[in-house]
Each structure stands twice: as structure tokens, then as C-alpha cells.
Amino acid sequence: MVTIRLARGGSKKRPFYHLTVTNSRNARDGRFVERVGFFNPIAAGAEVKLSVNQERVTYWLSQGAQPSERVAQLLKEAAKAAA
């Protein structure tokens, strides 16, 4: 099954996540099909906290991709910010 989930990056104690489209059997930070955005939970000041390519996310959802619980929350937050 294809999922949209977070892949962790960054360094120790400073997380940074990429929103990735991947096969659910792949490792969390392993091979992915496409990166569709990022999430920086510790963004400060003028740094961007959340960036999502809505066109690609909509495409993958229409193809049957299932977002993880956290990604679903982030997509809702991004849609609210865009409106």
C-alpha cells in the first residue's frame, strides 16, 4: 500500500521531517517514491514550519495513497493556512 508519511532528518535533538510518498513496507527513512513537502517542528522566527505541495498530495490521495495520522493533521493545518 502507498502511504504519505514523515521521514525523519535533521540532527540529534533537532528533528526535521520530509513528507514522503512511499510503500508502507519500506523503512521510515528508506526508499521513497516522491517528496511532497517538509515539516520543521522547531522552526523559529521567519523560518517556514510547514510546506506542502498540495497538487502532488491531491494527486497521490486520488491514486489511493493513505496519509498517516500525523500527516493527515498536517495536511488539514496546511489547507487552513492556504485558505
Swiss-Prot record:
Transmembrane segments: none annotated. It comes from the Bacteria. The keyword Ribosomal protein applies. Keywords: Ribonucleoprotein, Ribosomal protein. Gene3D superfamilies: 3.30.1320.10. GO terms for biological process: translation. GO terms for cellular component: cytoplasm; small ribosomal subunit. The keyword Ribonucleoprotein applies. Pfam families: Ribosomal_S16. One of its GO terms (molecular function) is structural constituent of ribosome. PANTHER family: 30S RIBOSOMAL PROTEIN S16, SMALL RIBOSOMAL SUBUNIT PROTEIN BS16M. Belongs to the bacterial ribosomal protein bS16 family. This is Small ribosomal subunit protein bS16. It comes from Pseudomonas putida (strain ATCC 47054 / DSM 6125 / CFBP 8728 / NCIMB 11950 / KT2440). The lineage of its organism: Bacteria, Pseudomonadati, Pseudomonadota, Gammaproteobacteria, Pseudomonadales.
